[in-house]
């Protein structure tokens, strides 16, 4: 089953909408973004979430002490590192880690093997001067069969109900990550979310899912 993460949750109304749609992995952005959220607001939402919900914090070049403080305060399950964090940044962090890689060309994937302490890779579009959340797609052929050392691939970057099916059939990711693609006028939209999930379901019917590492189980992230 292809997992789905909906990122950029800003309030309880959006969180409840996502949960009601059947998605159990929510992303909270603690970096400069139109969808950024304060730790206090994120914690308030997270304390209301039902069991078996996975929370992912998105960070961009956050100082380690600050990242650990926010992760502990908000009780985050997974940390998504979406900046230029080097492999050694990951050492000693207790939460499960996802390292985002911005894909410009085939050479963009050369650094994957250095990140031995992460549990998965999120592949996003490379846009000059932007860490992520651009709503821009990239050439999925570049990451088809990417050598990740057996670690799960989470596909992001401009995914929408209209294109996610094709992306899944080509890349066969462990999970897909969406934010702006399920929004209308900058807010999460139930009809767009439902259409996205239906497109994922239909795409799954056309291929057999590979077995994924249990380290990221629960991930159901563009911010």
Curated annotation (Swiss-Prot):
Q: Name one GO molecular function term.
A: phosphoribosylanthranilate isomerase activity
Catalyzed reactions: N-(5-phospho-beta-D-ribosyl)anthranilate = 1-(2-carboxyphenylamino)-1-deoxy-D-ribulose 5-phosphate
Q: In which pathway does it act?
A: Amino-acid biosynthesis; L-tryptophan biosynthesis; L-tryptophan from chorismate: step 3/5
Q: Which InterPro entries would you find in this protein's record? A: Aldolase_TIM, PRAI_dom, RibuloseP-bd_barrel, TrpF_fam
Keyword entries, A-Z: Amino-acid biosynthesis, Aromatic amino acid biosynthesis, Isomerase, Tryptophan biosynthesis
Question: Is Cytoplasm included in the keywords of this UniProt record?
Answer: no
Please name the Gene3D superfamilies in this protein's record: Aldolase class I
EC top class named in words: isomerase
GO biological process terms on file: L-tryptophan biosynthetic process
The family assignment reads: Belongs to the TrpF family.
The name this protein carries in UniProt is N-(5'-phosphoribosyl)anthranilate isomerase
Task: Tell me which species this is from.
Answer: Moorella thermoacetica (strain ATCC 39073 / JCM 9320)
What gene does this protein come from?
A: trpF
């Amino acid at each position: 089953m292809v997992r789905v993460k909906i990122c950029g949750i800003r309030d309880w109304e959006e969180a409840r909408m996502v949960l009601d749609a059947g998605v159990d992995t929510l992303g909270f952005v603690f970096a400069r973004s139109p969808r950024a959220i304060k730790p206090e607001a994120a914690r308030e939402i997270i304390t209301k979430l039902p069991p078996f919900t996975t929370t992912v914090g998105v960070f961009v070049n956050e100082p380690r002490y600050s990242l650990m403080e926010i992760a502990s305060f908000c009780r985050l399950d997974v940390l998504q590192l979406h900046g230029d964090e080097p492999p050694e940044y990951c050492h000693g962090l207790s939460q499960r880690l996802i390292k985002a890689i911005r894909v410009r060309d085939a050479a963009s994937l050369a650094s994957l093997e250095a990140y031995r302490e992460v549990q998965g890779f999120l592949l996003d579009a490379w846009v000059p001067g932007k860490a992520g959340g651009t709503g821009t797609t990239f050439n999925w052929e570049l990451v088809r069969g990417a050598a990740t050392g057996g670690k799960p691939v989470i596909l992001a970057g401009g995914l929408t109900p209209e294109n996610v099916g094709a992306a899944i059939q080509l890349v066969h990711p462990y999970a897909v990550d969406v934010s702006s693609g399920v929004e209308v006028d900058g807010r999460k939209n139930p009809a767009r979310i439902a259409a996205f999930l239906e497109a994922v379901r239909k795409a799954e019917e056309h291929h057999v899912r590979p077995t994924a590492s249990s380290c990221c189980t629960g991930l159901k992230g563009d911010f």
